[in-house]
């Protein structure tokens, strides 16, 4: 009887124990702590999201599949409604946004930006409609992120240290979504089908070319796309995007590849 009472008291004390609060965690990113020229290591990214998961009910992390490095992909989700039996199979009308970060870990802007964005979504600094669900692959190319260096992007303006373009098997993952030769691509496909996103954002940046615009766009050629989709792209989507960003003082221009050629010969499109 005495043992039972002690067990009951212990359980009550345990249930009344104070849960972690956001202020119990250091949620300032390495980028913000530094001089603006640092990006976190893979282990720092994982530790950050573990803390964010513990600090906020709206944030949850999942380990999915495996990659060529042997590590699983980490999917981080922001969901203000955690009452679903499964946040991937709910019956509610939800707009799903999936973000892919770190396909080339030397182009690390998206990794840092998503860490800050997820925190600011969770703490209410960034407001979103209730029917918006956001998921992000924390680091897609884990093998490349673990292979940090300071010299493979000599023409790129920072960061001081960064990951390598090739993955653990030296694949350029930017070329493997269809072939799926790598475990990374197969794990990505698993996440993609599980989430079934309405919008996919690949946080991909240039690797040192001197673009005068912060943002460039690479739309499919409307005359190759054809029919209603081509017309929609050419007459509605692209002009609207250009106008909206110009109004925010973020003008964009077409992305082009330039390989020691003069402008007069033209630029290749995709």
Predicted segment positions?
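Bacterial signal peptide processing site
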Residues: 17-19
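Sec-dependent signal peptide recognition
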Residues: 1-7
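C-terminal motif of bacterial Sec signal peptides marking the signal peptidase cleavage site
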Residues: 12-15
């Amino acid at each position: 009887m005495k043992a039972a009472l002690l067990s009951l008291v212990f359980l009550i004390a345990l249930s009344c124990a104070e849960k972690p609060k956001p202020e119990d965690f250091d949620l300032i990113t390495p980028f913000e702590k530094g001089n603006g020229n640092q990006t976190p290591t893979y282990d720092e990214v994982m530790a950050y999201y573990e803390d964010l998961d513990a600090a906020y009910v709206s944030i949850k992390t999942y380990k999915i599949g495996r990659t060529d490095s042997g590590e699983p992909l980490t999917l981080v989700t922001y969901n203000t409604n955690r009452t679903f039996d499964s946040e991937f199979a709910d019956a509610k009308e939800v707009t799903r946004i999936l973000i892919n970060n770190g396909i080339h870990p030397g182009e690390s802007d998206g990794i840092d930006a998503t860490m800050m964005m997820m925190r600011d979504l969770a703490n209410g600094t960034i407001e979103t409609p209730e029917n918006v669900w956001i998921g992000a692959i924390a680091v897609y190319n884990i093998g490349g992120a673990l292979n940090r260096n300071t010299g493979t992007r000599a023409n790129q303006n920072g960061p001081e240290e960064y990951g390598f373009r090739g993955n653990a098997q030296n694949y350029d993952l930017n070329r493997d979504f269809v072939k799926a030769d790598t475990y990374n691509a197969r794990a990505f496909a698993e996440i993609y089908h599980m989430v079934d996103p309405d919008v996919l954002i690949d946080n991909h940046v240039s690797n040192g070319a001197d673009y005068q615009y912060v943002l460039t766009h690479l739309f499919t050629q409307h005359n190759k796309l054809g029919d209603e989709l081509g017309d929609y792209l050419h007459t509605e989507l692209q002009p609207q995007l250009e106008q909206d960003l110009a109004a925010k003082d973020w003008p964009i221009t077409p992305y082009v590849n330039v390989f020691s050629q003069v402008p007069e010969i033209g630029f290749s499109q995709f």
